[in-house]
């Protein structure tokens, strides 16, 4: 579970390149994009699992997580025939309009103690066809405090995430290409080992948010990629009033996410405001302790959106160079 997307890694969020001289966020950030990764690739940070209310389960070694779907199922079968207008993502709790950009600001412990942490999400007008379905491309940039320069931010991850909405209003997660950087070594490129695309190596797409939010009493599948031991599940907890820096909202939808294949435990809570999207990320028992709130939200102008498009297409092209799974997809356009 990466972060967050308008939904939302997530968190774990999930999770993507702004350092090519183009930055939207008004803070001190830096990073570099080398042309090739080092030999050794590193795994992304821990995903989340098991709520405090759930019964205890056996601890297993980290290198042998339980590959189980006992805690979530595909309650909505995937069928490409049900996507007549997949790029129109107008779900009340997760609208994705090209040019929408928002920032979640907070803190997380990524192994260096609790540090400041910002994630910038941009809904692009780039299209990526996956399994024959035209998908909306979300550009996700994760900035963390630079250990060598406290008070400044450095790019830790840059990601392309793909979404589509079916005719019943379910928002589907259709894959991710996350590039990772070592912030303890000046932002050195580490590759993109946690890439997943539905239909390749047994990977399954899942739903970010179901269309009928009243039908969410049990856990439902968000994504499953056995080759990288990635399994995310979510359930709907209810609605509430919630306040963040950009405002206070009624009828905020609360979801609970977990990663049953990860023995380390923890849940991630996400909060979606009607007509706005993911305004808050919180945790229950998650060792990473990620807490984020929406600190800004705006609509990009035509020039800004064009600059985003260029960066996203460049990142898409890099995917064919650095990841064998991604190399099996069609180029974005």
Model-derived segments and spans:
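N-terminal secretory signal peptides that target proteins for export/translocation
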Residues: 1-8
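C-terminal motif of bacterial Sec signal peptides marking the signal peptidase cleavage site
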Residues: 24-26
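Bacterial signal peptide processing site
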Residues: 28-30
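Post-signal peptide N-terminal segment of mature Sec-exported envelope proteins
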Residues: 36-64
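Conserved functional acidic sites
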Residues: 55-333
């Amino acid at each position: 579970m990466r972060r967050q997307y308008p939904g939302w890694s997530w968190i774990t969020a999930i999770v993507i390149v702004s350092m090519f001289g183009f930055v939207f966020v008004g803070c001190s950030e830096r990073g570099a994009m080398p042309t090739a990764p080092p030999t050794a690739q590193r795994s992304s940070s821990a995903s989340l699992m098991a709520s405090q209310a759930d019964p205890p389960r056996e601890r297993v070694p980290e290198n042998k997580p339980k590959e189980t779907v006992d805690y979530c199922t595909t309650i909505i079968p995937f069928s490409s025939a049900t996507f007549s207008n997949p790029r129109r993502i107008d779900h009340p709790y997760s609208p994705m309009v090209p040019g929408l950009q928002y920032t979640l600001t907070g803190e997380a412990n990524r192994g260096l103690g609790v540090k400041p942490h910002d994630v910038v999400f941009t809904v692009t007008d780039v299209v990526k066809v996956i399994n024959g379905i035209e998908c909306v491309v979300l550009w996700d940039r994760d900035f963390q405090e630079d250990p060598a320069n406290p008070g400044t931010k450095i790019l830790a991850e840059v990601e392309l995430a793909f979404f589509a909405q079916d005719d019943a209003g379910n928002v589907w997660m259709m894959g991710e290409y996350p590039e990772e950087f070592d912030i303890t070594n000046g932002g050195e490129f580490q590759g993109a080992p946690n890439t997943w695309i539905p239909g390749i190596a047994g990977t399954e797409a899942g739903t970010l948010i179901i269309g009928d939010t009243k039908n969410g009493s049990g856990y439902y599948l968000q994504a499953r990629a056995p080759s990288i031991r990635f399994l995310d599940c979510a359930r709907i907890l209810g609605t509430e009033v919630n306040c963040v820096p950009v405002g206070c909202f009624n009828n905020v939808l609360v979801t609970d996410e977990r990663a049953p294949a990860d023995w380390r435990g923890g849940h991630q809570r996400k909060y979606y405001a009607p007509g706005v999207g993911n305004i808050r990320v919180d945790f229950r028992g998650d060792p990473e302790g990620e807490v984020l709130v929406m600190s800004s939200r705006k609509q990009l102008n035509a020039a800004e959106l064009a600059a985003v498009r260029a960066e996203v297409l460049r990142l898409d092209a890099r995917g064919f160079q650095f990841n064998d799974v991604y190399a099996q997809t069609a180029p974005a356009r």
